């Protein structure tokens, strides 16, 4: 019972901490005349993936590598199948040409990078499947390239609506930042400890908890944002949230975690990694062929069903 309480309290602290940290950092940056464009592409983008980053890094430091990797892989699968799926059921999603030809292929590339880095035994580059520091640095290099690309295309669309930033006094900005960081760190420890204890009490591997419970919990901000956007007749926001979050999760969150400490895959198998690649390809083909550049309600229902099938597989394999 206490482990569930730790899990819920930890998740609450992570989500609120990410919100306070993002608001404080954005307001402070604005006071130093940093443009809304730069703030949106860096601080706000970081804030939405702060739960995944916190959980994965704390898990890596605690020696729970399967929880760290499972969180990223599971979150990315959840993002595509459930967030896009549910949003499309609420309102069909129109995909821009740039997203279909550039951003989604980048997400597919991130899956391929993880597959290659995680298959040391098959590729005969090692005796154990592990994401080592070299793999982590490679992912961080890809993240730097992605960030540069994001800035480049953003400057070509400077007329588009930019993030609204609530003005705060300097001392309040600092209070938000420090308080947010404390909440993230403390909440991350509670969440990871609670998750690990639940795994032990149920007799299942941390990989399963990471791929399911932890992944769903850390993806709640993106789900809430996307559904609200769909209800306000702006479902296209979901695609941007999902693609940006998935790229951030693989290239930065997983890259940073593996750089801090090598991550053995353990219970994370090629089935999970190939499923992530498959659903990323599904997102591309759904927007490319069935109804050009649109995710329909039918496709949304299929995506939700595909997620249920994946969860069913994980339960069956216990």
Where are these regions (language model features)?
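Hydrophobic alpha-helical segments, chiefly the membrane-spanning helices
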Residues: 1-318
